[in-house]
UniProtKB/Swiss-Prot annotation:
BP GO annotations: photosynthesis; respiratory electron transport chain
Cellular compartments per GO CC: plasma membrane-derived thylakoid membrane
Binding site for heme b 1: 103, 205
NCBIfam families (alphabetical): PRK03735.1 (NF002990)
More info: Heme 1 (or BH or b566) is high-potential and absorbs at about 566 nm, and heme 2 (or BL or b562) is low-potential and absorbs at about 562 nm.
Bilayer-spanning residue ranges: 35-55, 93-113, 119-139, 189-209
Protein name stated in the entry: Cytochrome b6
Cofactor requirement: heme b; heme c
UniProt binding sites for heme b 2: 89, 190
Amino acid sequence: MANSSPVYDWFQERLEIQDIADDISTKYVPPHVNIFYCLGGITLVCFLIQFATGFAMTFYYKPTVAEAYSSVQYLMTDVSFGWLIRSVHRWSASMMVLMLILHVFRVYLTGGFKRPRELTWVTGVTMAVITVSFGVTGYSLPWDQVGYWAVKIVSGVPAAIPVVGDFMVELLRGGESVGQSTLTRFYSLHTFVMPWLLAVFMLMHFLMIRKQGISGPL
C-alpha cells in the first residue's frame, strides 16, 4: 500500500490486515440484494445499542426488591442524561424486536431458510427466542406494579405443563412465590446469561452467512 503510515505497517507486518480488508471489501454482493436485506444488520445495531445503554445502567441499578424501583427513579431524575440512556434502551429494544420480525419475514419470503442454509435459519430462530426472552426479563427489572405482575404471570405459565410444570415455576421464581430470588434470577439472565448466549449464536449466524453467502432470488 502506497504512502502507508508506520502504524499501518506495524499491524500489517504482524497481522496482514490488508488481506482481511481486501476479503471484506471484495465480497461478492448479488444484484438482487436490496434495502430489505439490511434488516438483519439493523437488528445487530440495535443489539449493540442495547448492550451499551444496558451496561451504563448497571452502574446505578440495584437488583433488590427494596431498591430496584428507587434506583430506576434515581437514574431517571438525578443522573446526568440517565433519562436519555434508559429511554434509548427502551426504544431500541422495541426497534430490535420489530427489525427482527421483519428480518424473519424477509428471509422466509425469499426462501433464505432452504438448503444449504438450514442451520443459519435455526440459529436465527434461536436468537429470536432469546430476544423475546430479553424483553420478558427486562420488563421486570424496575420492579414496579407492571413488572411485578408481569413476572408473576409469565413465571406461572409453565405450571400448565404436566409433570414438570411446578418444578419449572419454582426454578424460575427461585421459590414458591415471586420475590427477591425471582428478581435476582431475572437480572442475571437479562444482564449476563442471555447476552452471552445471543453473542455466541450471533457469531455462528454471521460465520455461516459469510461462508455460504447471501441466498439467491426465488
